[in-house]
Design a protein with these regions (language model features):
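Short, 15-30-residue, compositionally biased linear elements
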Residues: 17-21, 59
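Mixed-charge, Lys/Arg-rich low-complexity intrinsically disordered regions
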Residues: 2-17
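A short, Trp-centered hydrophobic/proline-enriched beta-strand micro-motif
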Residues: 21-29
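Acidic, low-complexity, intrinsically disordered interaction modules
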Residues: 38-59, 74-75
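Short, compact, well-ordered microdomains
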Residues: 61-91
Length: 91
């Protein structure tokens, strides 16, 4: 069966290159929470710190943790979000 999500996903090394090559980026991915494809503005590094995002693989999916500049902070001031199998990352 044809799986469009897998076909559209970027390679992990290309995503990391885009996310770390500039100050900010736009990342597009399917968000289960919203049941929709979303685009967010983010950074690889938490602002005013040297704390970086990360990449890992879980159950065959590429997971990217990034600082979401569009997000409302939670009670702890956290704006870290995770994107699973991003379709696009651009500066």
């Amino acid at each position: 069966m044809f799986n469009k999500k897998k076909e559209d996903k970027m390679k992990a090394k290309d995503v990391i290159t885009q996310m770390t090559s500039g100050d900010t980026f736009y990342i597009t991915y399917y968000a289960k929470k919203h049941q929709a494809i979303i685009t967010r503005k983010g950074t690889w590094t938490k602002p005013n710190t040297d704390i970086q995002g990360k990449h890992f693989v879980s159950k065959g999916n590429d997971i990217f943790v990034y600082w979401d500049l569009d997000a409302m902070p939670n009670d702890n001031g956290n704006q870290w979000r995770q994107a699973t199998n991003p379709m696009r990352v651009k500066l």
